[in-house]
């Protein structure tokens, strides 16, 4: 039998070879049915009992795992527990039971689908992927409704590579590392909580393979290449031996990376770079430190708004930000203000549906049109500044008028707090995202108004190249090293250094080791990324001289195409540390 190769998405790096275990995680197929009015009360009670049972199960899991792995990975369970208390989920299902006379299963499925639609149009991939958390919680409730017990991964006795349609974060927590070598799934993305948890636990994984469950049966020999998102089924002898060598080399390299965690990200000639983490929840702060990061370069605040029917209060804002500031102290925490549109945060009817939300009323535009929402968040952030080193980051600023207006609102909020006798840091630093080409083009003007720039490459690349990277027909054109993108980045860097303000990056580009030396050479001082990328980028930083990085950036900038720029970067990396290239 010839080997078969399946390509998906890199979720968590690593190479494992073993026998497959096909896990049944297909969704329960249950048709909704109408019920009689006399049964409505009982159906609502049945649904609420299932909610309570689901909550009990997750609380027990949390208690069980808190002893062995500490608190840094348990925030995902907290997220699922919070979803079980979500008003949109509970009230939406109860309403459908009462008004549409649907059974609990049918009402729940309709509610989950309706909530999912809100997430589908969110531009931010990380936030959009939270839809999977809602679906996974819904699946748990549904299984409890019908009394369908799920096969537990903790029961697996032999070493295996798990193959499944999808895997919930709770499944990942139950994976015993002495038995579960890694996993591959049909569904999923790099930003799913399952993928994030796999990286945090050091469990190799590939997701988004589409039909891997149809190609593999339990007992098949498989190679899981989590570095490239590849699964090889029934490998031939040459491939098998080649991957054994790669596996040994990777394990050695991992041990070398582990040694770097407590060391600073310092070039060979003494230039120190801040490597920081992107987070969503307070519980993720510990993981940043565990991976050798120094603070939070991007704290997404949208979680406070999503999946609810009431706006977060000032106290909710304050408590969330205070907790992160205290956990991260003495390092800095960069808090990004709300970065989605009004139609995505659970308050229908605020605005009409937009034909093109990516270019519509979102982020700072939304905040300036809804000043009450914006001011409440700013009050919470400012009050939290007394608890740590907090900085404020404004997203999607396109020009000076927006920036002037945000500064005016902030000054008004400061004045309010002073009059109320509420403490805050009067000198809190203010920064703005550079993620729109217009902002990059006038970055010299904008730099005079802020303390720092943070470049959001995900949107900047999409807007510059007019590409939707979720569109499979044009996604191949999404290229960070496109000459147009590089010239904008250099323009922003020149403006920041001329104004003597800090230059940071918090997009995916910041966490790619291939780009690290280029960004150093372009003058970036802070790089914020997914925590699992920190050791890899630190390896590059500690292996290069700043002079060489500047030379590389200049060389890459002179290339006429993205492919030539990439080849130039790869050659540079390979010449200086081939052991790293072998693992990329």
Regions found by a protein language model. Give the residues of each.
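Non-catalytic, soluble scaffold/interaction modules
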Residues: 1-327, 333-340, 370, 374-378, ...
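Conserved alpha/beta-domain cores
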Residues: 254-584
């Amino acid at each position: 039998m010839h080997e078969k190769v399946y390509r998906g998405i890199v979720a968590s790096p690593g190479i494992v070879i073993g026998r497959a275990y096909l896990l049944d995680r297909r969704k329960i197929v249950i048709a909704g049915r109408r019920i009689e009015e006399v049964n409505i009360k009982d159906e609502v009670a049945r649904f609420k009992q299932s909610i309570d049972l689901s909550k009990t199960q997750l609380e027990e899991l949390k208690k069980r795992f808190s002893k062995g792995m500490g608190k840094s990975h348990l925030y995902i369970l907290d997220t699922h527990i919070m979803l079980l208390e979500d008003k949109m989920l509970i009230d939406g299902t109860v309403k459908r039971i009462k008004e549409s006379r649907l059974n609990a299963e049918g009402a729940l499925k309709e509610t989950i689908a309706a909530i999912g639609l809100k997430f589908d149009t969110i531009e931010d991939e990380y936030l959009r992927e939270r839809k999977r958390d809602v679906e996974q919680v819904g699946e748990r409730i549904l299984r409890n409704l019908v009394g369908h017990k799920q096969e537990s991964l903790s029961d697996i006795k032999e070493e295996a590579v798990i193959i499944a349609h999808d895997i919930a974060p709770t499944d990942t927590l139950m994976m015993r590392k002495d038995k579960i070598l890694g996993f591959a799934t049909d569904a999923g993305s790099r930003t799913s909580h399952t993928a994030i948890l796999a990286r945090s636990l050091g469990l190799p994984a590939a997701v988004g393979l589409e039909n891997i469950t149809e190609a593999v049966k339990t007992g098949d020999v498989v190679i899981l290449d989590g570095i490239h998102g590849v699964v090889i089924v029934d490998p031939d002898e040459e491939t098998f031996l080649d991957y054994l060598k790669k596996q040994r080399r990777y394990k050695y390299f991992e041990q070398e990376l582990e040694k770097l965690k407590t060391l600073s990200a310092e070039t060979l000639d003494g230039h120190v770079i801040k490597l920081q983490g992107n987070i969503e929840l307070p519980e993720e702060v510990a993981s940043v430190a565990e991976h050798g990061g120094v603070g939070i370069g991007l704290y997404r605040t949208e979680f406070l708004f999503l999946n609810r029917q009431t706006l977060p209060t000032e106290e909710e804002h304050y408590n969330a930000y205070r907790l992160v500031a205290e956990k991260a102290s003495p390092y800095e925490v960069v808090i990004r203000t709300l970065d989605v549109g009004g139609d995505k945060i659970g308050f229908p009817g605020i605005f009409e549906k937009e034909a093109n939300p990516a270019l519509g009323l979102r982020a700072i535009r939304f905040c300036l049109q809804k000043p009450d929402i914006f001011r409440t968040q700013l009050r919470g952030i400012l009050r939290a500044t007394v608890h740590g080193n907090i900085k404020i980051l404004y997203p999607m600023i396109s020009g000076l008028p927006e920036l002037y207006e945000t500064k005016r609102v902030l000054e008004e909020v400061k004045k309010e707090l002073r009059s109320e006798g509420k403490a805050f840091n009067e000198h809190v630093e203010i920064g703005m995202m550079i993620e729109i080409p217009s902002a990059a083009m006038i970055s010299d003007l904008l730099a005079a108004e802020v303390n720092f720039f943070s470049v959001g490459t995900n949107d900047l690349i999409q807007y510059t190249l007019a590409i939707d990277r979720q569109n499979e027909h044009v996604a191949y054109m999404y290229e960070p090293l496109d000459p147009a993108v590089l010239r904008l980045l250099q323009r922003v860097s020149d403006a920041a250094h001329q104004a003597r303000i800090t230059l940071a990056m918090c997009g995916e580009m910041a966490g790619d080791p291939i780009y690290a030396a280029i960004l150093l050479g372009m003058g970036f001082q802070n790089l914020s990324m997914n925590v699992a990328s920190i050791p890899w980028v630190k390896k590059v930083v500690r292996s290069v001289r700043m002079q060489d990085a500047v030379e590389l950036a200049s060389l890459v900038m002179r290339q006429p195409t993205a492919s030539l720029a990439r080849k130039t970067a790869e050659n540079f990396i390979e010449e200086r540390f081939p052991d790293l290239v072998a693992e990329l």
